[in-house]
A protein has these predicted regions:
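Beta-strand-rich domains and repeat architectures in extracellular enzymes and scaffolds
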Residues: 71-95, 301-306, 323
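Beta-propeller domain segments
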Residues: 56-64, 172, 189-192, 206-212, ...
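Surface loop/turn motifs at the tips and blade-to-blade linkers of beta-strand repeat domains
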Residues: 73-77, 115-119, 160-167, 216-220, ...
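A short loop-to-beta-strand structural motif that recurs across blades of beta-propeller domains
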Residues: 99-101, 140-142, 203-205, 254, ...
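Conserved beta-propeller blade signature
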Residues: 90-93, 132-135, 182-186, 235-239, ...
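Asp-box/WD-like beta-propeller blade repeats and closely related beta-sheet repeat scaffolds
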Residues: 140-178
């Protein structure tokens, strides 16, 4: 009997566990529910040693434009979320289950896999700068120095800051360094919709690499899980997830653009750029806030995004924005579960979106994967992380 290698096995087991129990670790789950699902999980784990190898991920179901190809780079990264690449070709991957992973890459293949740390509180975001790996962990930002040369024996992390909000609802944080050398850190709203301190929640902030000189960059942002800087204008662009419980088709997720510090994007008063909040929007018209560049659709859960500047894809893709849509969880008919691209003029104007990769959502609303982040590579390929399948995919192009 052939058994799966441990990382791949537990990735598949996680998917089986979710499918059987309907459980996924999110804020607000009761203690009784956790206990019940953990008992079921324990039963599954006891049977793990005797389970045969399970089917590989159905990657051939993914539809792409002509000439594009997708393959599984790794299925040994459970709950894979944010990605960051070092100049040495080491891919760092955050997760929702306490681990941070490193994949050594060569010629588009994984040559080694490492666990950098474990037991952290939702270390979803990772960023690399000057030889160090920065990791978000809800209220903390940690730094692992000289990490590229210590993958097998990672150093003890340095606490960059431990003063971020402790709330776990929208508490996971995508992080990235901007062209100004600052570390950008979002602080999501601790709720579906609520009026909290707007200097503490619903914003993007930035700080020096050592954690000093923190300042708010933009407000009125419910929950951004992806941002990047335009390769020509160097302006900050970011996704934002719209509120829930207003219906299947409102409000839209947004792609926003912040060319200067201090802009307000409306939350909790206005959603999707044109939908007043029924509770908080009465005295705050949507016209008072910065509208989105693109309305991405309701409940698609737009997460990671990057500008594509590589040369492998056709020229029409250069400077496009790729966005990972994690997919809906509270809509009567599921949407998202795909990767889209946003096309703009060279200055970022006239933006519109097109579907790039789809097939994680199958007919009958069966889901086998959920894109979480995207990462362009130096060779021009594009990586996609998937926290549901515990995988990273690699997209390439060759002339049809």
């Amino acid at each position: 009997m052939k058994l799966l290698p441990p990382p791949a096995f537990f990735s598949v087991l996680r998917a089986v566990f979710r499918r059987i129990t309907g459980f996924s670790p999110v804020a607000g789950v009761s203690g009784a529910a956790r206990a019940r699902t953990l008992r079921i999980g324990a039963t599954l784990l006891l049977a793990a040693a005797t389970l045969p190898a399970l089917a590989a991920l159905p990657i051939k179901r993914i539809k792409l434009p002509p000439g594009f190809h997708i393959e599984v780079l790794s299925e040994a990264v459970p709950s894979a979320r944010g990605m960051a690449l070092s100049p040495k070709g080491i891919l760092y991957i955050g997760s929702l289950d306490g681990h941070v992973y490193a994949l050594e890459l060569r010629d588009g293949h994984v040559t080694a896999r490492h666990v950098i740390t474990s037991g952290l509180e939702t270390p979803a975001g990772v960023a690399w700068r000057d030889g160090a790996l920065y990791v978000s962990a809800v209220s903390k930002i940690l730094r692992f120095d000289a990490i590229d040369t210590h993958l097998s024996d990672p150093p003890k992390p340095v606490i960059v800051t431990d003063t971020l909000p402790t709330e776990t609802h929208h508490g996971w944080k995508f992080i990235a360094f901007g062209p100004d050398g600052k570390l950008y850190v979002p602080q999501g709203a601790p709720c579906n919709v609520c009026l909290k301190d707007r200097d503490r929640f619903g914003l993007i902030g930035r700080m020096n690499p050592d954690g000093s000189h923190y300042e708010v960059v933009a407000r009125g942002i419910r929950n951004t899980v992806g941002f990047a800087w335009h390769p020509v204008t160097h302006e900050l662009w970011f996704t934002d997830n719209g509120r829930d419980l207003m219906g299947d088709d409102v409000p839209d997720d947004k792609l926003n653009r912040a060319p200067r510090v201090g802009m307000d994007f409306g939350f909790p008063y206005c959603h999707g750029g044109d939908t007043p909040d029924p509770e908080f929007g009465k005295d705050h018209p949507c016209s008072a806030f910065t509208p989105p560049v693109v309305k991405l659709g309701a409940h698609v859960a737009s997460l990671g995004m990057r500008f594509y500047t590589g040369s492998m894809f056709p020229g029409a893709y250069r400077d496009n924005i790729f966005i990972a849509e994690h997919g809906s969880w509270n809509r009567s008919k599921k949407v998202g579960y795909r990767v889209v691209r946003v096309i703009t003029n060279p200055d970022g104007s006239n933006a519109h979106q097109e579907v790039f990769a789809e097939g994680w959502l199958q007919p009958g609303e069966t889901v086998w994967g959920r894109p979480a982040d995207v990462q362009p590579m130096p060779d021009g390929s594009l990586l996609i992380s998937d926290d549901y399948a515990g995988a990273v995919y690699r997209v390439t192009y060759s002339t049809p």
